[in-house]
């Protein structure tokens, strides 16, 4: 069913959930895995960059480290992942990379936001559901590493 799964990852708890659920789905379907980390270029980051030269470069360096850890974890699970770290607006970058790699499933984490925060920052999920040309899984099932590896073991991994 799914042959090319894109995992959106930012190192957060929600990103970890997306990584776990996406890896389980990819394993179940025998899919190729793609990983994307987006350094969000938000107004806050631009303000930080204006007052602290190098703030964006530091944020990118942090994300590169998170990306490498996630890639290593996926390799340990038997995947041969491909991916990259980009800077920009997460929803736009995820949709663009999904088209680029011809993904048939995109997995993102769910981060709860208040009404004001949703209005101010926009809706990544809504943008993706409108702009993706493939299925979208919004990972919400927070499982521990033990449960995750147990599910992989019972799946024949």
Locate predicted features.
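Structural beta-alpha unit
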Residues: 72-106, 143-157
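Conserved beta-strand positions in the Rossmann-like core of class I SAM-dependent methyltransferases
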Residues: 34, 82, 137
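Small/aliphatic-rich secondary-structure junction motif
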Residues: 1-53, 131, 156-157
């Amino acid at each position: 069913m799914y042959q090319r799964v894109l995992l959106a990852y930012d190192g957060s708890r929600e990103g970890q959930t997306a990584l776990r659920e996406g890896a389980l789905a990819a394993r179940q379907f025998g899919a190729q895995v793609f990983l994307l980390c987006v350094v969000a270029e938000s107004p806050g980051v631009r303000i930080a960059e204006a007052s602290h030269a190098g703030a964006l470069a530091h944020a990118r360096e942090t994300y590169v480290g998170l990306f490498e850890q996630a890639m290593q974890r996926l390799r340990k699970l038997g995947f041969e992942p491909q991916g990259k770290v980009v800077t920009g607006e997460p929803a736009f970058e995820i949709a663009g990379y999904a088209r680029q790699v011809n993904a048939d499933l995109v997995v993102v984490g769910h981060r709860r936001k208040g009404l004001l925060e949703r209005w101010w920052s926009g809706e990544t999920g809504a943008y993706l559901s409108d702009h993706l040309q493939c299925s979208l899984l919004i990972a919400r099932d927070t499982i521990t590493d033990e449960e995750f590896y147990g599910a992989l073991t019972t799946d024949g991994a």
